[in-house]
Amino acid sequence: MDIVTIGEVLIDLTQTGKDEKGIPQFAANPGGAPANLAVAAARLGAQTAFIGKVGADAFGRYLKEVLAENKVDVSGMAVDADHPTTMAVVSVDAAGERDFSFYRSASADVMLCKEDISEGALKAAKIVHFGSVSLTADPSRTATLDAVARAKKLGAIITYDPNYRANLWKNKEDAIAQMKAPLPLVDILKVSDEELPLLTGTTDCESGTAQLAQKGIKLIFVTLGANGVFYRFGDKTGHVAGVPCKVGDTNGAGDTFFGAALS
């Protein structure tokens, strides 16, 4: 298996417009950063698998079907009969930028536990990828960190996207501490220009990524929205400009970029 992703898959209720009475209309779209990355890489030919947990409900069944239809192995996807599939309400402004409201308290993805993640799946993986959303609460935090540590010992390349969502954390200080905790295990890191100062205390890509590289991270991407991406590989750094285009919705853009890079 080329890439195994661990974490959340959820429903993005995305506003699509308003009806004739001005009532907002929403579409139920599949989402969740690790799942998005698995799909993006699979579409480019990589063999991918997703490990996570959904509810025993219509949304959970739909998400499993969507991943399978996109050639993502879902054999490691658990179903929780007692907790619902996670949902996020996503509003998009005129520039295509997003605002998230999560309905996640006691949802299925948070209930991922160590026993849900098989040793066989980790042994088979060339790359094991995770994000910070599964680090916001236990038992998913402990399960994710345990799986990543096991995968590292088994020789997998560890990739990480902090994917900061302020309203999922108790406070900013807790978020920073938890997002930093797994960095010594990471081989390849993707952060946004919003997340770089949270992890390093600076907005400067050169000095910020140099700090991160000292933790043993071999390859670092800093996504810059319309301005493209900054990268560091050891002592070598560079910038790739963004391609001008009409933006409809930036949701999943970073996941798609990282999935393409890893594939």
Which residue ranges define each predicted feature?
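Glycine-rich phosphate/adenosyl-contacting loop at the front of the ribokinase-like
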Residues: M1-D73, M77, K246-G248
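Conserved phosphate-binding/catalytic region of the ribokinase-like
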Residues: M1-V4, A149-K153, G201-S263
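Proline-centered loop/turn at the N-terminus of a beta-strand
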Residues: D2, Q47, I157, I188, ...
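Short beta-strand scaffold segments in enzyme catalytic cores
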Residues: V39, M87-S91, G228-Y231
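Conserved N-terminal subdomain of the carbohydrate kinase-like
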Residues: Q47-F130
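Conserved beta-alpha-beta core of the PfkB/ribokinase-like small-molecule kinase fold
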Residues: V133-A210, G228-V229
